Amino acid sequence: MLDVTTFDELRIGLATADDIRRWSHGEVKKPETINYRTLKPEKDGLFGEQIFGPSRDWECSCGKYKRVRFKGIVCERCGVEVTKSAVRRERMGHIELAAPVTHIWYFKGVPSRLGYLLDMAPKDLEKVIYFAAYMVISVDEDARHEDMPGLENELRLEIKTLQDQRDSQIAERLGRLETDLAALEAEGAKSDQKRRAKDGAEKEMGQTRKAFDEDISRLERVWEEFRSLKVGELKPEDAVFHELQDRFGIYFEAHMGAEAIQKRLEAFDLEAEGELLREQIATGKGQKKIRAIKRLRVVSSFLATGNSPAAMVLQVVPVIPPELRPMVQLDGGRFATSDLNDLYRRVINRNNRLRRLLDLGAPEIIVNNEKRMLQEAVDALFDNGRRGRPVTGTGNRALKSLSDMLKGKQGRFRQNLLGKRVDYSGRSVIIVGPQLKLHQCGLPKQMALELFKPFVIKRLIDLSHAQNIKAAKRMVERSRGQVWDVLEEIIRERPVLLNRAPTLHRLGIQAFEPQLVEGKAIQLHPLVCAAFNADFDGDQMAVHLPLSVEAQAEARILMLASNNILKPSDGRPVTLPTQDMIIGLHHLTTLKEGVAGEGRAFSSVAEAILAKDQLSLDLNAKVRIRLHDIYFGEGEAPEGVELDEKGKTVGPVLLETTLGRALFNETLPVDYPYIEAVADKGKLSEIVNDLAERYPKVEVAAALDRIKDAGFYWATRSGVTVALSDVLTPPTKAAILSGYEKQAAKVQGQFEKGLTTNAERRQELIEIWNKATAEVAKAMEDNLPADNNINRMVSSGARGNWMQVRQIAGMRGLVSNPKGEIIPRPIVHSYREGLTVAEYFISTHGARKGLADTALRTADSGYLTRRLVDVSQDVIIREDDCGTSRGLDLPIATKGADGSSVRDSNVENSVYARSLAADAVNEAGEVVAPAGSDVGDVMIDHLIAAGVHEIKVRSVLTCESAVGVCAACYGRSLATGKLVDIGEVVGIIAAQSIGEPGTQLTMRTFHTGGVASADDITQGLPRVQELFEARTPKGASPIAEAAGRITIEDTDRSRKVILTPDNGDEPHIYPVLKRATLLVEDGQHVELGQQLHVGAIDPKEVLRVKGVREVQKHLVGGVQGVYRSQGVPIHDKHIEVIVRQMLRKVTVVEHGDTDLLPGELVDRARYNEVNRATLTEGKKTASARQEVMGITKASLATESWLSAASFQETTRVLTQAAMEGKSDPLMGLKENVIIGKLIPAGTGLAKYRDVTVTATEEAKAERYPNRIFTDESVFNESDLSFVDFDSFSSDDYTPGTYN
């Protein structure tokens, strides 16, 4: 059936004024919201019912029409349509602006799209838009050219007239001066008076000359401006411009504000501009070419989409529905309102004032000021604070604009579309439930009743315990007896989901069958704690209820805890026995010498148990017990024991073992080889690993439960306790320390005599004290008796490690100062002895730094996970096989000194769980395994035994699927151990596998004993981030750009490494820091890509010099290096998925005859497709350069604008996408979650949506043992959808419902 939400693409574009008017249901003319007396929305206001619909269902504003029977009528009195009030969530209004305004996203975003289109600097744009300068819109070139001679003559004439006037006025004044001087002479005036008269006249003449000269120069400037006038020029508002407008206004048009921009955009010829820019790109160089490329990108997007650039200037502002910007009455009668209403109010007020001023014909300066204020009001509405100071509300808080509603963690995308709260859920504290089976959890009765309430109510009515819903509800609220019976029936075989935050990987949500328990705490199976990273110190967990039959099926089949035994990150079991269980099993399987019953023989385990109960036999005594039908692994059977072909003993066998070990083996499957060893942490891990490989999950889960039960049982009986007397300080400690004290004093003495430097002294002291600490630790371990409880806990792997014991019983050792440098004086006391004040003080630095670091790490690791998920969320298994013959050559073994093959230590996480891309051939040239074979543990052993050292395996890095990856290249799913299914979201699993252990990685750089040096290499989490972001590392080492010979030039100030290539090219010069440690010597021959000094390498350089395969190796190896150093196993294929995403784009260098733009980033798949099409037409193909992008940049460069916008830089992404008229193909997960569709992965894939399931008779009988369906009208199979396993929810099918 087709759904309304079934569409393939989602496009975003630029809305024109007509679009906005089409969406609108009326114009908002008044800034009023709600009438304070009647509390009804004001007419034509921001909440007007005439525009947005009635505020009460089926009722007009004046109350003339009430009830649903008047549906669709528009009241003639108040003008309100009678309909549901829900329309107030979807009906929009609009504001008709009295003057156009620019959209701030297009003008102020970086880069400024308007600026690129009009080829203007953002500064100049701002001057025009905010009324600080005029912009020339058009010039009538023909008329100007035609009239130029006449106008020039006129102007010259005017200038001549002015000059004549000036000269005549000066001459007249000179004449007057002479007359005055003659008169003064006649009067016999003093020389002072004459001089004053002369000075006065000269001053007057100067002023006259200056005034005339200014007029003449102004005319000349006006003329020059007129002659050189061109479109797009900016003119300040001054006398020259006003004169220019008065004199030559008919030849040109100049405007201010958004109106100017609008007129320019309307007259803009996109095609001509595109041609011009292509020409510039072909001929230009440097900055000019780069700018032309950027401008062409903007021009092309408008040409391609048919969007009108004039839509970037608004004449109409849309008003969003009132329910999305609500106004609510508070208790005190005051109102709380959304900030948007204030911002809309400002726009309406200013718009109305401007309209009034225009009607009154106000002076231009006042009108312009009002237009500028309107522009600022609309800016604040769209993106408050983007330009100038933000508009603030009460308490100086910046108001939340439309952009802020979308941005960030609290924005619409991340808060409401990607993370919704769900119904049918609860949360409570967790406690341990050791009696549970692996697939069960304990659900508090009250909680279960609340969660299943609707189902309980329905069942009560079906069973006639209640007549109607109200009565049933009352029964539930009063907790009647029948209610619990019904709840018990409903809950049977109905899975619930348990989730513990933070959900770092997919094992953070698992399904369990609930068991009703008393109390209010959820009971959790102890073996699943590791997957949830849960402990019982107050952790809480949430419970969710899968409702539909499909959801229940998925929960039971895919998410049940007993089906999730393996970790998706490395394929190893996650449900390992821990702590109490380990100590119990260790106690059970230990062998003790000289204890009761040693050497006795028993006819059966039962007889041995009897002897133990009678206290004549110790659990750990070495005895002989007759056992039947036991299995042994290859070469493990005792001498003289006969085995059949399956490894099973023929007849009974008298086995030398302990009773404990015999009991332990009873917990394992019948045909599992007999374990004759101490079950410590390592051994148990091996056993569980083996079980997971050999047996179906049901069998493994049962065995794990038996192991768990045995562990707890014997832990209780082992009586393990800890007292202070168990912490034994080694008696030789003082003697050991005094010896090292002497050595330290000697080193200090040498330093004081000036024989060694401070750095050498520190280094030597650190080495001395490290040796001392190690020796004390060794003495302490030797001093602890084997049956010491602390020793048992640590050596069995149940809890703690020797370092912790050493600090309690031996000595604390060296600690570091706040800078991270090691203090060369150790803490010689242990916690058992107590620390001195100074020792306590210096040890607090490290402890506090540890806590601060952990807090930082958690946040950093979370952000890394988010970026990884974002970049890889559309990597889904899309096909079975892409058909490529490419692959990676990976080592599986090396040749030992004796010629034998030594297994490579990283095989588990490199070639394991993949398939061969080519035949595996040994040195003799024999094919050991054909291409396409699955590489598992058995196959690896087989290959190594046959002498194969390197194999070529399929990898996602070489997969040629256009979208997602193929199953053959990915290989086995590590979580199931089988070939990955189509629809598996391998991208997100990869991101979780890398991100989940992120918190365990150390922070910052490591300092090598003391002062920071160039050897400080970024490690831990920051290094992983540096690699995934493809950043140039700090102090990056250059790599040889060709094979050649090295020359080192050393001067006082600097050092250079010069590489002379073998092929006679120009030498390459690398400046190197003086303190850097070189890896090459003078005169040495180096190969292409060889590192020149100690430090990290820039991935971009590796790509440029050595190519794609090498940069892939560099990134995968670098990330693995960090995780391995922390002992965290992650399979290479997860890192490869991310690296594939980092390398999927290419930059177009030459566009040839394709429609690609030079400098454009395109998907490699699209680039190849375009080139293929161009080749078939016989045209010139494009050429491109491979790019390595950081994960943040790669996430933003995705094809999906929805995914990019919900990740980061929301406004920038949306601006660009709207301008380009982008279509979202809805291939990834996020975009489908945002629009509320099923994700195109797993069971949400289209191919899995049309499966019909029919229930067998057996299944029906199983579900309803007490009912017989004979009546066709009651139970018509064609009306139902069934799931072919025995777990229907009890409320799904009830007689009498489906007729």
UniProtKB/Swiss-Prot annotation:
Binds 1 Mg(2+) ion per subunit. Binds 2 Zn(2+) ions per subunit. Residues 188-209 are annotated as: Disordered. GO terms for biological process: DNA-templated transcription. Keywords: DNA-directed RNA polymerase, Magnesium, Metal-binding, Nucleotidyltransferase, Transcription, Transferase, Zinc. It holds the Pfam family RNA_pol_Rpb1_3. It catalyses: RNA(n) + a ribonucleoside 5'-triphosphate = RNA(n+1) + diphosphate. GO terms for molecular function: DNA binding; DNA-directed RNA polymerase activity; magnesium ion binding; zinc ion binding. Mg(2+) binds at D535, D537, D539. Zn(2+) 1 binds at C60, C62, C75, C78. Its cofactor is Mg(2+); Zn(2+). Zn(2+) 2 binds at C882, C959, C966, C969. Signal peptide: none annotated. It comes from the Bacteria. Belongs to the RNA polymerase beta' chain family. DNA-dependent RNA polymerase catalyzes the transcription of DNA into RNA using the four ribonucleoside triphosphates as substrates. HAMAP family: RNApol_bact_RpoC. The RNAP catalytic core consists of 2 alpha, 1 beta, 1 beta' and 1 omega subunit. When a sigma factor is associated with the core the holoenzyme is formed, which can initiate transcription. PANTHER family: DNA-DIRECTED RNA POLYMERASE (PTHR19376), DNA-DIRECTED RNA POLYMERASE SUBUNIT BETA (PTHR19376:SF54). This is DNA-directed RNA polymerase subunit beta'. It comes from Clavibacter sepedonicus. The gene is rpoC.
